[in-house]
């Protein structure tokens, strides 16, 4: 969905599925980011720590969402198909500033997707817990 009105038109089962797809789509990029940050010689430890923390929090959120969807639709999780990440572009030069810019872009996309997920979950909470009275 492009906006709040479109999201409100989507059935809650489809919205849950969309959240799972978006979360699953971040598995490989976040693993790659953590691996790449470890290879940067002059990267402060806090950057590596934050990259690992982001990866772990995303995994925990995905696991929680899978449990919720598993209770609503047992057995559907195994049939869920998502597009795997094709990997980093070979066109990205290996110099450190280009890699840092690639991380910035990756985190910008993650932030955008995180906001979408947050909004979808708030919409689901409103529908399912408060009967749409939000």
UniProtKB/Swiss-Prot annotation:
Signal peptide: none annotated. Disulfide bonds join 126-134. The keyword Disulfide bond applies. PROSITE patterns: SOMATOTROPIN_2 (PS00338). It is found in: Secreted. GO terms for molecular function: hormone activity. The keyword Iron-sulfur does not apply. Keywords: Disulfide bond, Hormone, Secreted. One of its GO terms (biological process) is positive regulation of receptor signaling pathway via JAK-STAT. SUPFAM superfamilies: 4-helical cytokines. One of its GO terms (cellular component) is extracellular space. Its main location: secreted. Coiled coil: none annotated. Belongs to the somatotropin/prolactin family. This is Prolactin. It comes from Bufo japonicus.
């Amino acid at each position: 969905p492009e906006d709040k009105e479109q999201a409100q038109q989507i059935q809650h089962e489809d919205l849950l599925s969309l959240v799972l797809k978006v979360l699953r789509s971040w598995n490989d990029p976040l693993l790659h980011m953590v691996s790449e940050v470890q290879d940067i010689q002059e990267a402060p430890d806090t950057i590596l720590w934050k990259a690992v923390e982001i990866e772990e929090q995303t995994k925990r959120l995905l696991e929680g969402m899978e449990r919720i969807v598993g209770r609503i639709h047992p057995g559907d999780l195994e049939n869920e198909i998502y597009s795997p990440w094709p990997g980093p572009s070979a066109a990205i030069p290996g110099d450190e500033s280009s890699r840092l810019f690639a991380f910035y872009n990756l985190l910008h996309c993650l932030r955008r997707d995180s906001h979408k997920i947050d909004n979808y979950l708030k919409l689901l909470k409103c529908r399912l817990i408060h009967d749409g009275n939000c």
